[in-house]
């Protein structure tokens, strides 16, 4: 097939997107596809023209645009197949406040949170105790995220988010091991235990610098925890209306597992978690890419 490989864009996660695209292009080429690289810009008519000239679009995008559902909406309107979730599910997963509300309604355990619009100023105070994680509501890769241990640190943490044009989410800072569990098709992949070698949480450096974190797959946890990780990941995938694949992040708090967020376009760099989980399940990187294309084509066949 002739495949448009879309990467770059203008989000704060552009570098991650481009890094993943290098690996994806190699895999697509090894599978015998003709690859047309495309750096997404605001030229949406140009994007649609390029997409229509291809048989399939592979999205290597993170943040907005990409995980916000914008390219997916344009591709749906053009009738061009792509991998992963559609516009609505993509946006709901990217929007942390919206997705956490859906988790709450579905009785999926998630840390307490407070949403702070960027025009509300920096005087907000959550009604749950310290520590707090302050995050961009629409961001990813832990970019611009701050761990707040003292209340007087909160205004600066909020301003850090607001300065980049996003609303903020203040989340309960639970302690415990970090875990992630991916969904591929209608099955959960083996979960991964994450141990950052430096820092207090799985930040940008831990995620993308080589050997910055120990990522153990399958996670060395009790069978009941593995079963619950699979159940919650599949449930979150369904609640958000996702398809194809996703990856859910968790904290194993003293009270039990807590669902943090779901990624609809998980990282595909050499250090990324989804390829590691797929490898443990017996799928090479090229196998994973082929499966995502297969799922994308099947999903396109279901669209009206």
Swiss-Prot record:
GO BP annotations, alphabetical order: cell wall organization; peptidoglycan biosynthetic process; regulation of cell shape
Enumerate the residues binding ATP.
126-180
> What does the cofactor section's free text say about binding?
Binds 2 magnesium or manganese ions per subunit.
Positions binding Mg(2+) 2 in this chain are 261, 263
Can you state which reaction this protein catalyses?
2 D-alanine + ATP = D-alanyl-D-alanine + ADP + phosphate + H(+)
- Which positions bind Mg(2+) 1? 249, 261
Q: Gene3D superfamilies of this UniProt entry?
A: 3.40.50.20, ATP-grasp fold, A domain, ATP-grasp fold, B domain
- Biological pathway: Cell wall biogenesis; peptidoglycan biosynthesis
This protein's cofactor list reads: Mg(2+); Mn(2+)
Q: From what superkingdom does this record's organism come?
A: Bacteria
Cite a single GO MF annotation: ATP binding
Q: State its location(s).
A: Cytoplasm
Q: What class of enzyme is it?
A: ligase
* Annotated ATP-grasp domain residues: 100-294
Q: Which SUPFAM superfamilies match?
A: Glutathione synthetase ATP-binding domain-like (SSF56059), PreATP-grasp domain (SSF52440)
> What is this enzyme's EC?
6.3.2.4
The free-text function statement in the UniProt record for this protein reads: Cell wall formation.
Identify the HAMAP family for this entry.
Dala_Dala_lig
Q: Which family does it belong to?
A: Belongs to the D-alanine--D-alanine ligase family.
* Database matches in PANTHER family: D-ALANINE--D-ALANINE LIGASE, D-ALANINE--D-ALANINE LIGASE B
* Protein name as annotated: D-alanine--D-alanine ligase
> What lineage does UniProt assign to this protein's organism?
Bacteria, Pseudomonadati, Thermodesulfobacteriota, Desulfovibrionia, Desulfovibrionales
Q: Report the gene name.
A: ddl
């Amino acid at each position: 097939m002739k495949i448009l490989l879309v990467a770059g864009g203008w989000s704060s996660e552009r570098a991650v997107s481009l890094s993943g695209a290098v690996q994806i292009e190699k895999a697509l080429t090894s599978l015998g596809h003709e690859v047309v690289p495309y750096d997404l810009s605001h030229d949406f008519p140009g994007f649609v023209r390029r997409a229509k000239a291809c048989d399939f679009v592979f999205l290597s995008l993170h943040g907005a645009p990409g995980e916000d559902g914008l390219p997916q909406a344009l591709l749906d309107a053009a009738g061009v197949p792509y991998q992963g979730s559609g516009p609505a599910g993509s946006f709901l997963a990217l929007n942390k406040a919206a997705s956490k509300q859906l988790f709450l309604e579905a009785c999926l355990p998630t840390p307490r949170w407070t949403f702070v619009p960027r025009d509300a100023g920096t005087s907000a105070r959550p009604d749950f105790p310290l520590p707090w994680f302050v995050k961009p509501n629409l961001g990813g890769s832990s970019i611009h995220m701050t761990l707040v241990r003292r209340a007087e640190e909160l205004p600066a943490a909020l301003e850090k988010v607001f300065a980049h044009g996003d609303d903020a989410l203040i989340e309960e800072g639970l302690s415990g091991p970090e875990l992630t569990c991916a969904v591929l098709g209608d099955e959960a992949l083996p979960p991964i235990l994450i141990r950052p070698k430096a820092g207090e949480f799985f930040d940008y450096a831990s995620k993308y610098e080589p050997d910055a974190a120990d990522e153990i797959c399958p996670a060395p946890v009790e069978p009941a925890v593995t079963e619950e990780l699979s159940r919650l990941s599949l449930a979150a995938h369904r609640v958000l209306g996702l398809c194809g694949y996703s990856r859910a992040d968790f904290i194993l708090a003293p009270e039990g597992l807590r669902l943090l967020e779901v990624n609809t376009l998980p990282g595909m760099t050499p250090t990324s978690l989804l390829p590691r989980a797929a490898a443990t399940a017996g799928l090479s990187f090229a196998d994973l890419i082929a499966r995502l294309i297969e799922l994308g084509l099947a999903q396109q066949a279901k669209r009206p």
